[in-house]
Every structure is written in structure tokens, then in C-alpha cells.
Amino acid sequence: MEGGALAFGHGRMKAFSVRGRGKVKRRGPAGGRSSLHTRDGGERCPLRRTGKYGKGKDMLFSASRRTDIPTYYSEWLCNRLEAGNVCVRHDARRVTRYVFSREAVDCLVLWTKNPLPLLDRLALLRGWPCVFQFTLTGYRRDVEPGLPDKLQLVEAMKRLSEAFGSERVIWRYDPIFFSGAYSLSWHVRCFDALTERLEGVTRTCVVSFLDMYPKLRRRIPALGLCGDSGQARKGLLAA
């Protein structure tokens, strides 16, 4: 699988990934006409109405683990959908243009903590094979200061489920960490409360624990986090 990261705005932020075995690459002199080629063959690759870049070459657009595009760039995303193409900046000189159309894309995966800015534009997404990776926890504003009230987000998830189906809305309860304010028992109570509100809204829930990278470990005293506790993890998963 080939991958890429999209640069948009002024080219300083990378926020988009494109995955597929038939990576489409723009070639040609600057200012001249360019044609679309596949990296693995170098031959012109016509788009098929099956949504494939050639036989067996699925195209997945994932937007994105690097930033919350539905929250901050929903207008940009919809503009790209209407334009039918998107440019990917790999470095200062190299830019790849991808076809961004319903016929070419097999799945559009949107990662978000707050889809509210996108809800008024859902009509543009109808007909697209969308999957939403929706992160929703009970952390308060000391951890997630930029989010709306959690009950608003529950209602937003319900709207996505009604529009696209419960199987296309994946609930992510992550990352899980433990501190004085967020204990094992707190997570159990919070998770139970959310599952009651989200009954029938989603069919899948993903949980994961905070990765304790060296840089984060140095900040643990300031953040008030407890050390990585295998016992606490087992207790939460067994609850």
C-alpha cells in the first residue's frame, strides 16, 4: 500500500492520507500539461466506474489522524469533493494530484472529535461510502478544552448514524489514561453512561490506552498522570 499526506492552506500543514496500491502521480514539466500515471507501472491508468484504479487497486482516503478535518476544515473538504481532485504535497517541490471523485474513491474515512461543523453539509456526502471514526470520551475541559458539551456530541453521533447507518459510525473511547481525577472507577461509570446513550447509534466501539512515549513520561508529573498500570488496564477491560 502506498501512502501520502496532503498539504493544504499555505502548504504548512499535512493532514490527509491516501492509500491504495495504484498510487496516482502527476508528471510533466512545470506549467505544461500533465498526465496521470501509476507509480507501480508508469502507464496511463484510466478510472473505471467501479471505483478502482485498475483491477484490484482500491483507493482509501483517510482524513485524518493528523488533524480534525471535519471540525476545522469541513468547508475545505466539501470544496475538494465538489472539485473532484485533491493535491498532496510531499516536500517543497513535489506535489501529487489525486482524483477525488465518487467513482474513484472506494471509501472515505473521517476521523473526528467534533463533527458539528460538518452536519449542515451532510447532503454533499450522501452517496459516498463514508465511515466515521468518532472519538467520544467523558473527559472534562481540563483535558479537552476545545470541545462542545458532550451531550451535543452524542446528538451529533446520532445524526451521523441516522444519515449513514450505525455500521458506518465507529465510536472510539480513547485514549484511556489514569490520574487522580480520572480513576479506574471513573472510566467505568463514564463508559457505562455513554453506552446507554449510544445504544443503537453504533455497532462498534474501539478502546485504546495512552501510549507512554518518552517525551510524555517526562511530563507525567506536570500532567498528573499515573504511571502505566497493567493492573488498571486489566481491571477496566474486565469491568
What are the functions of these language-model segments?
Residues 17, 34-35:
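Serine residues within intrinsically disordered or low-complexity segments
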Residues 2-8:
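Extreme N-terminal basic, low-complexity initiation segments
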Residues 37-144, 150-166:
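Conserved Radical SAM active-site core
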Residues 140-147, 175-185, 221-233:
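Surface-exposed cleft-lining segments at the edges of enzyme active sites
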Residues 152-219:
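Conserved C-terminal portion of the radical SAM core fold
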